[in-house]
A protein has these predicted regions:
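Membrane-proximal envelope and lipid/glycan-remodeling enzymes
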Residues: 1-6, 10-474
Length: 474
């Protein structure tokens, strides 16, 4: 469903197309319900009037994504890890029952040897404990649905729903930024940019698959939109902290996105250097915002840390070091989860890998280790030469930089994938940079690049064959 209003005073959107000069004043007061009208019906009507664009974007995205999901839409994916985690919680256990696992792909297995927790090796033992080796918040979201459907809950159609919701939330974020004067985009521009997220980025193929890897990335985008909306100018620090913790417990690299709130709290601009110099004598307002942000993030963070200690003995360990019988274990044992050793291959996956063209027979294919972002997100070229550098230019770029670092030094490129899927963690920030960068969506070069991005990601949505197809031989 589309996002609820952030405050009771947030005005609805005008139905008329707007010029960029009136982007920040695009609202009118909601219509007054007639006397004696049903209050629930009136409230729904007012809400739909205020958020009709979000509703339409949700419906369009849901229809297109579900269509491209095709037969996957009606079946659980072959990597439903979060469903098994949620069902285990409902059964009163913190591990998962190995007897019901659908496969052994990317599950953590822990064995206690001489009082120490180690990865299971060789023949499995009765006392070995099995866990989902991914941050657990998506399983929390799935809990009520798994309570109804059990192990049979369909994570693929759920992922399509979350993907459509993320598109609506991204539009809501863009509209909010326009109303706050942070961008000069009008309603039509914001609609186009929301559709670019949906169908002109790697979000497209990730949102139609289900599967533990892609489902978490899509949910991370939705939670990022909610986090950024509340973090701008550090206006709602508690809510920003709550959504930040949800995002981090969905996609761990988003822990670095906390920098965005810190910058908004300490030095929102425009004269950031002067604001930083003044902090020693005027620190209380910023400190209060940071404290409230921490208070919002702390409950889920503490629960996750305790859960990790119970499972793996360390508060920051989600389980990848305990992968059972996995191809990445040799690298993890030698270099760890993050290392400079991995930088070269991740740079190649993110920026250098090109489509593979064969003339005999004619064939166009992709490398499942990655595909250059210059094709999957060609709008990048305009970010390097922005026409304007407004207040959010620096914090958004710094957030992109720190969120990109984990994926570049990680032991895995994201294989199997279409494009460098780890970039989806910071794709919303990149699109926001374009939104504030001053390039017109009517510019011919921009239109050509947008069309290229949609074409390439259409190819990815149609052509990518991942774990589900491999297992089921579709």
């Amino acid at each position: 469903m589309p996002p609820a209003p952030a405050t009771a005073s947030e005005p609805p959107e005008s139905t008329a197309p707007l010029s960029s000069s009136t982007a920040a004043t695009e609202s009118t007061q909601p219509p007054t319900p007639p006397a004696g009208a049903n209050p629930v019906r009136s409230a729904v009507r007012l809400w739909l009037s205020a958020y009709r664009v979000e509703v339409m974007l949700f419906l369009i995205a849901f229809a297109v994504l579900s269509s491209f999901s095709s037969q996957r839409f009606f079946r659980q994916s072959a990597a439903p890890h979060f469903i098994y985690q949620a069902q285990s919680w409902l059964e009163g256990r913190l591990d998962v029952d190995p007897r019901v696992l659908p496969n052994l792909e990317d599950w953590a297995c822990v064995r206690v040897v001489d009082g120490h927790k180690v990865r299971c090796e060789g023949r499995l033992l009765r006392d070995d404990r099995w866990f989902v080796s991914f941050p657990s918040f998506p399983a929390v979201v799935m809990l009520p649905f798994v309570a109804l459907h059990g192990y049979q809950f369909n994570d693929t159609s759920f992922g399509v729903f979350v993907g459509a919701l993320a598109v609506a939330l991204f539009y809501s974020l863009l509209r909010f930024l326009a109303q706050e004067g942070e961008t000069e985009r009008n309603r039509n521009d914001n609609v186009v940019l929301s559709l670019v997220l949906a169908f002109g980025t790697l979000f497209f193929y990730c949102a139609i698959r289900g599967e533990v890897w892609f489902g978490a990335q899509v949910m991370g985008v939705a939670l990022t939109c909610l986090y950024v909306r509340n973090a701008v100018k550090a206006r709602r620090p508690v809510l920003a902290g709550v959504f930040y913790s949800m995002a981090v417990l969905t996609r761990t690299p988003l822990v670095f996105a906390g920098l965005f709130f810190v910058l908004e709290a300490l030095c929102p601009g425009p004269d950031r250097l002067a604001q930083l110099k003044a902090l020693p004598t005027a620190w209380k307002p910023a400190f209060r915002k940071l404290l409230l942000f921490g208070a919002g993030a702390a409950p889920l963070a503490l629960l996750a840390a305790a859960y990790n200690v119970y499972r793996f003995g360390k508060p920051g360990e989600f389980g990848h070091s305990y992968f059972y019988n996995n191809r990445v274990n040799a690298d993890i044992d030698r270099f760890g989860l993050f290392n400079l050793e991995y930088l070269s291959r991740n740079i190649q996956a993110a920026f250098l890998k090109l489509p593979q063209v064969s003339l005999s027979p004619p064939r166009l294919s992709y490398d499942p280790h990655g595909l250059t972002l210059l094709l999957t997100l060609p709008l990048l070229v305009f970010l390097l030469v922005p026409r304007t550098r407004p207040r959010l230019h620096l914090p958004l770029w710094l957030t992109v930089a720190v969120c990109a670092l984990p994926g570049l030094f990680y032991q895995n490129t994201g294989y199997m994938q279409f494009g460098f899927r780890f970039s989806l963690d910071y794709t919303p920030y990149l699109l926001l940079l374009f939104a504030i960068g001053g390039w017109s969506l009517r510019n011919r070069a921009v239109v050509a690049v947008l069309a290229l991005g949609v074409l390439v990601n259409f190819w990815g949505a149609v052509a990518f064959r991942g774990y589900t197809e491999f297992v089921r031989n579709w």
